[in-house]
Regions:
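Class I SAM-dependent methyltransferase SAM/SAH-binding core
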Residues: 30, 36-85
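A short SAM/SAH-binding and catalytic strip from SAM-dependent methyltransferases
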Residues: 95-107
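Conserved Class I S-adenosyl-L-methionine
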Residues: 174-248
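A short acidic, Gly/Pro-enriched loop at the edge of an enzyme's catalytic core
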Residues: 84-95
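Short, glycine-/aromatic-enriched active-site segment of Class I SAM-dependent methyltransferases
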Residues: 130-152
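Short alpha-helix
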Residues: 153-169
């Protein structure tokens, strides 16, 4: 499993997140930022759902081979796509899940407006992954200083994510919480998959769950939610006009 993971343990995240979801056989599920598709294979085997294993960084061809080797190619479909440019029709999915990848794109104030159109009204969107137990509002805590880089400002607390989604008035938030002993599990997994990353390991050892851990959020698209139109281009017609008053 370690060789098939690009970040947090995908099965830990999938088990934790799905315990807060009502997945039924035959549902269509988007696994957004699926990495090497281990979570997608798990979702089908465990719940009998159809899964679109979608990722930008990892090869769809490689994921396709992994899916075939698992014998689930009739129900798990590898897709190479950017989370901001998804090749699906509106209201195609019953459920959308994102495991340890949503922070890379979901902090955008406009992103939920975009993503929610792909799930049916009443359908659920759930995320789980690395986050903060409390927000870091000013200076980086000293014990995290050697590890922290500017890209880690995408990490947030469960309460931050709740507010981020609630204010759109698109989702009814059903759960926003943290994983018990999440920091220790993060540390244990990182020691296995990246033992040479001493900066992160030392940060986790020193933190002991004060700031670092795993967060989870599940919301359901409101049936009366109004999604703004997605503007892909502005139609225009060129009419030649002088740029300066002195021009004919």
């Amino acid at each position: 499993l370690a060789s098939n993971s690009g970040a947090a343990n995908p099965l830990w995240m999938a088990e934790w997140l799905t315990s807060a979801l009502d997945l039924q056989r035959g549902m269509r599920v988007l696994d957004l930022g699926c990495g090497r598709a281990a979570s997608s294979i798990f979702l089908h085997r465990e719940f009998g759902v159809q899964v679109w294993a979608t990722d930008l960084w990892f090869s769809a061809a490689e994921n396709g081979q992994r899916i075939r080797d698992a014998g689930v190619e009739d129900s798990v479909f590898p897709v190479h796509a950017d989370a901001r440019s998804l090749p699906f029709s509106d209201e195609f999915f019953d459920v959308i899940v994102s495991l340890d990848s949503f922070s890379y794109y979901g902090t955008d104030d406009l992103y939920l407006n975009y993503l929610a159109r792909f799930v049916k009204p009443g359908g659920a969107i759930g995320i789980a992954g690395a986050g903060l137990m409390q927000e870091i509002d000013s200076f980086i805590p000293k014990h995290l200083g050697d590890w922290w880089t500017n890209d880690l400002w995408c990490l947030h607390s469960a309460s931050w994510w709740r507010r981020h989604w609630e204010r759109t008035q698109i989702m009814d938030i059903e759960i926003a919480d943290t994983m018990p002993d999440g920091c220790q599990l993060w540390l244990d997994w990182h020691r296995l998959i990246a033992p040479d990353n001493e900066a992160e390991i030392k940060a986790l050892e020193a933190d002991r769950g004060e700031y670092l851990g795993y967060v989870r959020l599940v919301g359901r698209r409101l049936t009366n939610a109004t999604l703004p139109d997605q503007i892909l281009s502005v139609p225009t017609q060129y009419i030649k006009k002088p740029l300066l008053r002195s021009e004919p």
